Amino acid sequence: MGELFRSEEMTLAQLFLQSEAAYCCVSELEELGKVQFRDLNPDVNVFQRKFVNEVRRCEEMDRKLRFVEKEIRKANIPIMDTGENPEVPFPRDMIDLEANFEKIENELKEINTNQEALKRNFLELTELKFILRKTQQFFDEMADPDLLEESSSLLEPNEMGRGAPLRLGFVAGVINRERIPTFERMLWRVCRGNVFLRQAEIENPLEDPVTGDYVHKSVFIIFFQGDQLKNRVKKICEGFRASLYPCPETPQERKEMASGVNTRIDDLQMVLNQTEDHRQRVLQAAAKNIRVWFIKVRKMKAIYHTLNLCNIDVTQKCLIAEVWCPVTDLDSIQFALRRGTEHSGSTVPSILNRMQTNQTPPTYNKTNKFTHGFQNIVDAYGIGTYREINPAPYTVITFPFLFAVMFGDFGHGILMTLFAVWMVLRESRILSQKNENEMFSMVFSGRYIILLMGLFSIYTGLIYNDCFSKSLNIFGSSWSVRPMFTIGNWTEETLLGSSVLQLNPAIPGVFGGPYPFGIDPIWNIATNKLTFLNSFKMKMSVILGIIHMLFGVSLSLFNHIYFKKPLNIYFGFIPEIIFMSSLFGYLVILIFYKWTAYDAHSSRNAPSLLIHFINMFLFSYPESGNAMLYSGQKGIQCFLIVVAMLCVPWMLLFKPLILRHQYLRKKHLGTLNFGGIRVGNGPTEEDAEIIQHDQLSTHSEDAEEPTEDEVFDFGDTMVHQAIHTIEYCLGCISNTASYLRLWALSLAHAQLSEVLWTMVIHIGLHVRSLAGGLGLFFIFAAFATLTVAILLIMEGLSAFLHALRLHWVEFQNKFYTGTGFKFLPFSFEHIREGKFDE
């Protein structure tokens, strides 16, 4: 059970793998996903490692598969995902896979090349068909006398005078529709108005054979006179990427050509359909297996990457690897090695040897789908130091609770809970869909956090008795007005003469006792509602904050005990807990004392806690003004201040001085430079054991004391301790004030909710007519939208970030160093989930 509250115990192990069995053994280990390989060749270039050729072959196969996948997605063919986990192919199977992928790639490339050529021919014939159809209309217009007048500028005046026959040349083609205006202006300027342009739009968009996009085009015909203008026109057409086509001059020739073009288009369409059918069959066959192929290739690539991290012994028959692994999983790792050896057919077993090392192991916290999100919250602050207390189990409760204190609303909590329950119930379907939306994936990964935040918000909403800014009168109010008339001095004239009246709980029957659960609903209509709620929430925030911080300081004790650091207990934990309890723990006691010591009859004489707390630090106790809370208060408060002040030098001086004394004593005894040699004591080398007098243990008190490789610097130690002491003492004050954000955010949420109700939904409820009922439909839609957008999303995100800050800074800095590095075992699970690149 203790492993739940701190990271797993890790060990460094050495693997001896036979060359013929190494591939299968690594495959089994990565299928298990419990080992992290260390790079034993950090100085060797990646291109000079033993298995670099195999890695390149895997990358080439991966490239071919990505090409096939791109073609499949382009054809809108669904990729079949059965969730199958294929076995890793043997190295000898790589040749067959390469040949298969090469065949599919070449076939697809050949189909694409042929299809592109066919589509280009089809496009040209289609454009020619439209040219022949449109130009007939243009030539018919040429016979119009008005056109002759319009085009008379193409002839020189002296030529017209000679009565020479009108002989115009022309070119016809197709151009993108958006280029027509610029094309026309360019022709006019370059040819100085000596050309005549006619154009008509093609109604249907045409497919580009290269990109596959559909573009709108227009047919044009340009009339000119002379070879010089003809050359200019062709140059301009070439510059605007217009396609020119031959067009017969006589109607009969155009008709015959159009007939031939239509026949060729029909034949070409048939060939295109057959080509597309063949391409679809190839892609559909590939779509059934491409996910399995991807997994196989990437598993092989991962294995060869891992083998490149290993050393090769001088005989070239054995690979040596070093791995970090959890101690509890050593047996399963041994079984995996045995399975790998059997699959490879090797007769020599692989050897797993635990190593002794002074290196800090990686941090590994076991999680499940429920605790994974909370562990990510902790890890975002910093990966825990090896074997220190893990805050995640406590964060499971404290994080959603502090969020709910700021977000307390019964109605909003229900909406948040329903959304989280929907994600939890459909998690299998959502996971299988593999949604690529980054925002939704982030929200979905925190579904259990949102679920607990919603449930706790329902609870705190009932405590505050707040549901969409309105109170729920479940048990009936405990306050009554009648006794103010029957026993008190209220009359009808009192009601008429006063705009605001205050109930007196000291009169019997006015206050019937505490509300069974939460706050009495009568406060929702009271004019002093904010005064009462602010006082309640402010004191509650201080109480919760101090309890939270004291709990964090208490957790540091378990770290000191586990790492066997008595100095940190006596000169760290004890003065820290006394300092905080003497000042702020005493404040919590005063709050509870004032709540219980003063009732309705004596509440008007209750002194101010704020004034008392300030006077406590100033040692100021005036005779008049704020009355004492209890007898002997002055002496107790002076004693607590003195104790708190004594804790400062206790934290600051004692530990550095004791460390200095221990260093000088060891130096005097000469043990620090004892000439022994440290040798790792592995389980198979019992004879290689030379133990030094001052040998260190990873869990000993001396772990933080200077070793023979270090020089003790009293100045550095003193400065470090001074920084820690100042940070803790000032942090107690600032962190306590920081917890007032619980009150501030709760107040802001309640006020926003009330404003939204008053300014939106109240308008629809106020109109008593049929039109008001119809308007309420739209008003409620606006109210629901604003509630979700502002109060649930924006306010929820704000409360989430503030709760995050309270845990990272105010809570975790009391015991959590977070200077470790994460245990990152490579697992085939990441490949199956499509996270290989991560």
UniProtKB/Swiss-Prot annotation:
Location, primary (coarse class): membrane
Chain ranges on the Vacuolar side, renumbered to this chain: 408-409, 472-535, 595-639, 751-771
Cellular localization per UniProt: Cytoplasmic vesicle, Clathrin-coated vesicle membrane; Cytoplasmic vesicle, Secretory vesicle, Synaptic vesicle membrane; Melanosome
Subunit structure, interactors included: V-ATPase is a heteromultimeric enzyme made up of two complexes: the ATP-hydrolytic V1 complex and the proton translocation V0 complex. The V1 complex consists of three catalytic AB heterodimers that form a heterohexamer, three peripheral stalks each consisting of EG heterodimers, one central rotor including subunits D and F, and the regulatory subunits C and H. The proton translocation complex V0 consists of the proton transport subunit a, a ring of proteolipid subunits c9c'', rotary subunit d, subunits e and f, and the accessory subunits ATP6AP1/Ac45 and ATP6AP2/PRR. Interacts with SPAAR.
Record topology, Cytoplasmic segments: 1-388, 427-441, 556-573, 660-725, 811-838
GO MF terms held by the record: ATPase binding; proton-transporting ATPase activity, rotational mechanism
Sequence similarity: Belongs to the V-ATPase 116 kDa subunit family.
Modification Phosphotyrosine occurs at: 364
Residues with the Phosphothreonine modification: 250, 360
CC annotations in GO: clathrin-coated vesicle membrane; cytoplasm; melanosome; membrane; perinuclear region of cytoplasm; plasma membrane; synaptic vesicle membrane; terminal bouton
Name listed for the protein in its UniProt record: V-type proton ATPase 116 kDa subunit a 1
Described function: Subunit of the V0 complex of vacuolar(H+)-ATPase (V-ATPase), a multisubunit enzyme composed of a peripheral complex (V1) that hydrolyzes ATP and a membrane integral complex (V0) that translocates protons. V-ATPase is responsible for the acidification of various organelles, such as lysosomes, endosomes, the trans-Golgi network, and secretory granules, including synaptic vesicles. In certain cell types, can be exported to the plasma membrane, where it is involved in the acidification of the extracellular environment. Required for assembly and activity of the vacuolar ATPase.
TM region positions: 389-407, 410-426, 442-471, 536-555, 574-594, 640-659, 726-750, 772-810
Record's keyword terms, sorted: Cytoplasmic vesicle, Hydrogen ion transport, Ion transport, Membrane, Phosphoprotein, Synapse, Transmembrane, Transmembrane helix, Transport
UniProt topology in membrane: Multi-pass membrane protein
One GO process term, biological-process aspect: synaptic vesicle lumen acidification
Pfam families referenced in this protein's UniProt entry, alphabetically: V_ATPase_I (PF01496)
Gene behind the chain: Atp6v0a1
